[in-house]
Amino acid sequence: MNDPLASAAEARSATVRLAVDCMGGDHGPSVTLPACRAFLAAHPGAELLLVGRPEALAPAAGWERCTLVSASEVVAMDDPVEVALRRKRDSSLRVAISQVKPVDGVAAAQACVSAGNTGALMAVARYVLKTLDGIDRPAIATVMPNQLDGHTTVLDLGANVDCTAEHLLQFAVMGSALVAAVEGKANPSVGLLNIGEEAIKGSETIKRAGELLRAAAAGGQLNFVGNVEGNDIFTGRTDIVVCDGFVGNVALKTAEGLASMLSSFIRQEFTRSWYSKLAALVALPVLRHFKNRVDHRRYNGAALLGLRGLVFKSHGSADAFAFEQALNRAYDAARNRLLDRVHDRISATLQALPADAGAPDGQVPEAA
């Protein structure tokens, strides 16, 4: 009989190898290399494939548990998708993604992390890795803080501006697999973002998505609790909130802007006078805790779900601390076999649904 504790210990001790696009993002190696070094120090069981121009990676030469992979080109943050796909075939972004594509059944890395151009990353990842069976379009998923001192997983966050009801169902399945794998929740709750809780509200697409999600819940494939509203992302009513990429991206950027504004307001008020500065000293422990809870850098690292390989997107403007969080998320996903879990859950769910619930449409996803 297998010992679950021994199995868990063995899984934790297994080596996880990540491929890192060191040239991506607004800051490139000046951010990615320090983040990689901090990540390695915190994860003795991890190895990194650092991808980029040799001269840029020179400071990492000789690092333990690191392999340098040469790439002669860089995808700029404003490069069109077609440039990344057709012209820059030796870009650090593409080479890093290629490390997670199996060759003779074995991949060089278990997950890829990049802070590069979102549209290019999604398009190249889809071209190189392809989508899983039963998935029309990949989705971007990340976590947002909630008032329960936890977080809510939200998807899609910008990969697909226009979605069908079937796409939203697939997002729910993939999001459930993500939360189950990384957070250990066997049956995470799912809500469908809408303008009200009632099933009669919303567009025809949302209504149809609700029907599909309820059917999946009736078959025991999902824990769908119904429609949720925007504020429910932050109340923690559900573990997962599903929406199209346009709405999700707006919600994400709004939340980041609000957190920044609140921090600015608090700073202004506590520096307004000598009395307020004195009050700030007294409240300093509380303020630090508040800042830590709303710091969007802690939640950096969005998963590109639905591909035949694990790819994580860091914010393009991330600093070293934020990029390290993206590495942490990729590490946890790889260690907990996220890819296998997504595949298994998709297969089980689609078998219980009508055959028209998602034939691949072959379209390249849009990027917000």
From Swiss-Prot:
Pathway: Lipid metabolism; phospholipid metabolism. GO terms for biological process: fatty acid biosynthetic process; phospholipid biosynthetic process. GO terms for cellular component: cytoplasm. InterPro entries: FA_synthesis, Phospholipid_synth_PlsX-like. The keyword Aminoacyl-tRNA synthetase does not apply. Gene3D superfamilies: Isopropylmalate Dehydrogenase. Its EC number is 2.3.1.274. One of its GO terms (molecular function) is phosphate:acyl-[acyl carrier protein] acyltransferase activity. It is found in: Cytoplasm. It is an enzyme of class 2 (transferase). Its main location: cytoplasm. It catalyses: a fatty acyl-[ACP] + phosphate = an acyl phosphate + holo-[ACP]. Keywords: Cytoplasm, Lipid biosynthesis, Lipid metabolism, Phospholipid biosynthesis, Phospholipid metabolism, Transferase. Pfam families: FA_synthesis (PF02504). It comes from the Bacteria. Homodimer. Probably interacts with PlsY. Catalyzes the reversible formation of acyl-phosphate (acyl-PO(4)) from acyl-[acyl-carrier-protein] (acyl-ACP). This enzyme utilizes acyl-ACP as fatty acyl donor, but not acyl-CoA. Belongs to the PlsX family. This is Phosphate acyltransferase. It comes from Methylibium petroleiphilum (strain ATCC BAA-1232 / LMG 22953 / PM1). The lineage of its organism: Bacteria, Pseudomonadati, Pseudomonadota, Betaproteobacteria, Burkholderiales.
